[in-house]
Amino acid sequence: MRTFSRGMALAVLVCGSAAYADRNDIKITNLGNPSPVASAGSTAPSVNFNAEANGDFRAFARTFAAVMTSANLMPPETLGHAGFSLNAELSVIGLPTPGREDGQVTIPTEGAPTNPLLLPSVHVRKGLPFSFELGARVGWIDRSDMFTATGELKWAVNEGFTWLPDIAVRAHVTRLMGNKDFDLTAAGLDFGVGKQFPLGGMVTLTPYGGLDLTGVAASTDTLDFDQTRQRNTTTTPANPYAGLDNTGVYQEVKLMENVNSRLYGGVRFIGGALQLGAEVSLSNQGFIEVANTQTGATRSRALPAVLSFSTTLGLDF
């Protein structure tokens, strides 16, 4: 019996867990197949055809990039060359109504996405000489296997003057991790202004705000849009390339052609080493041109704004 128990324990340790997708994991093929035919030169209709699938992918990429970059949670002033900050953060983000009309975007999740979406994260910052600051943030998309990884570099153009506000520029790059079949990256410049007010002793209050311009880049691997495909239907001698039917990629989303603008405002409280903060953010995505792959017609589509509320709790050394 003891030998059996040891064997079972070893099996549990050695064997990997079964693959499982949670409700907020992305299934990108849910956006549909952009090709009206099964393959090049074929007249057979494609499976899961969506004439505006490329536009839906672009709209999704820009919206989810806005979700990934929805928080700043720090004023423009830097920590100083010896400073260090460690924070736990939480963003609550409102998702748009699913659909293809103006103000709608479909997030192709495995199940019904949670709305609002929660994005907890850990944020580490280190002060550098000459008013520079280096930071890193790792966040988790709630109810999914996906994470966000952010690297940032901030430079305070002006800070610490009695009668002048603090002004800073922040460069940042965020990448979605743990996703399947597609890549999503957001990179941009953030321009912030704020002013620290002493409340007595080591207690300060700093209101701040700014504008964040973020470019979005996204692409996909070769996708199989026929999710009911059986192996014996793709190995017939009559069509040795049947396995390539109903496969393809979405049109690439290019960084410099897809820029979101985000306005944010917040306040930070410091009492000794304790740091508290709250921030409201609104990301505006503007319009995109959507092409119909069946008719060749194009139309202008308004993307929804993404509203978020974020909080932070940490230690500032």
PLM feature segments, named:
Residues 86, 128-143, 166-175, 275-284:
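Transmembrane beta-strand segments that form the barrel wall of outer-membrane beta-barrel proteins
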Residues 80-84, 130-132, 147-149, 163-167, ...:
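Outer-envelope beta-barrel architecture signal
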Residues 1-8:
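Bacterial N-terminal signal peptides that target proteins for export
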Residues 21-64, 77, 92-97, 101-103, ...:
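Outer-membrane beta-barrel transmembrane domain signature
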Residues 153, 304-317:
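Outer-membrane beta-barrel "beta-signal"
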